[in-house]
């Protein structure tokens, strides 16, 4: 959770995912869409921000031979880069989707760690035209078999994650999704970020934001 120093507008901190961990620093990737991000874009080196975190859990690194498939939708791609760096030795397959070319993020950084992403845009301005889940379906249709094991990691719009969960079920794949929800307190007290799961309501800021994809009750949306 992050806010600009000495600012009461916006009053509440906003949740941001961790883009990259460095030796003594962290990087946050954001899109300028509201009051806080408009303040952030004008910040300079040595300016002060107020941060509470880290909150909740992260993506688990699965042991074994399963090859990771990472799927990011729009700004939801941000938290997947740190994971990609961590598991690059497992040769992850990375799908990135967005509405248009200008919303495709950090492909240069992925290539610098040896990952060439599979890109799709809704309008066809970069990569294949269509939804990122359509690209994944084509890939799995041609590469999935009883002797091939994949593990899904994803973050993005809820509609994308819902479709991804259904698609993964058809191919008998397991995986993890990071949910993007509005938060007020970030410590589990206000319950503004609860989601319905097969094990009852859970707080994204405490029990999440990462959940096994099959745990979320999408029909409750």
Residue ranges and their predicted role:
Residues 79, 158-159, 180-209:
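Local cysteine-cluster metal-coordination motifs and their immediate loop/turn environment
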């Amino acid at each position: 959770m992050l806010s600009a120093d000495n600012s009461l507008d916006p009053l509440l901190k906003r949740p941001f995912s961790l883009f990259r961990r460095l030796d003594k620093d962290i990087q946050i990737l954001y899109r300028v869409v509201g009051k806080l991000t408009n303040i952030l874009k004008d910040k300079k080196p040595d300016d002060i921000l107020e941060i509470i975190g880290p909150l909740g859990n992260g993506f688990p690194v699965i042991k074994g031979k399963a090859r990771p498939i990472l799927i990011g939708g729009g700004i939801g791609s941000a938290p997947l880069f740190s994971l990609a760096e961590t598991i690059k030795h497992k040769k992850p397959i990375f799908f990135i989707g967005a509405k248009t070319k200008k919303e495709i993020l950090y492909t240069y950084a992925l290539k610098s760690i040896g990952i060439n992403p599979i890109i799709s845009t809704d309008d066809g301005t970069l990569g294949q035209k269509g939804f990122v889940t359509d690209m994944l379906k084509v890939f799995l249709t041609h590469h999935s078999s009883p002797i091939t094991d994949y593990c899904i990691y994803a973050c993005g719009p809820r509609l994308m994650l819902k479709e991804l969960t259904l698609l993964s079920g058809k191919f008998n794949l397991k995986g993890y999704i990071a949910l993007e929800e509005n938060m007020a307190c970030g410590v589990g007290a206000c319950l503004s970020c609860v989601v319905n799961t097969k094990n009852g309501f859970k707080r994204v800021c405490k029990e999440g934001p990462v959940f096994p994809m099959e745990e979320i009750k999408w029909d409750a949306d």
